[in-house]
Amino acid sequence: MKLLFPKDFAADLPLKQAQFEAQSQILTAAKVFTAPMTVAAWTTKPSWGIVAGADKIINPDLERFYYQRAHSHITVLAGASHSVYESRPKEVAAVIEDAAKHAQQ
């Protein structure tokens, strides 16, 4: 996994940073996959989504499909990897700020 991580998960980050991230990953708690969900928030609340245009972990077309289905405000960041929050922090922050500003209106 550590050899694939920089290429697949963090392709638009500097190699040393991607390697550090590969070494510092922790396992996800299994209960996140089995916890019951009674209501999907996107059915009653506005949502925002970022399509990472060069994501190799989640296909960008699938990301776009999910966001369209949820009627999300969609931002596409061409060339961004799955680590978009680190490689494009200003653009991600702008989406978060837009959501914070408009979510309650």
Question: Whereabouts are the PLM-identified features?
Answer:
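Helix-rich cap/lid subdomain of alpha/beta-hydrolase
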Residues: 1-39
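Short glycine/proline-enriched coil/turn segments at helix->beta-strand junctions
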Residues: 26, 44-45, 70-73
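Alpha/beta-hydrolase-fold serine-hydrolase catalytic core, especially in secreted/extracellular enzymes
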Residues: 105
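Short beta-strand/loop motif that positions the catalytic acidic residue
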Residues: 43, 48-51
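Short secondary-structure boundary/capping segments
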Residues: 38-41, 64-66
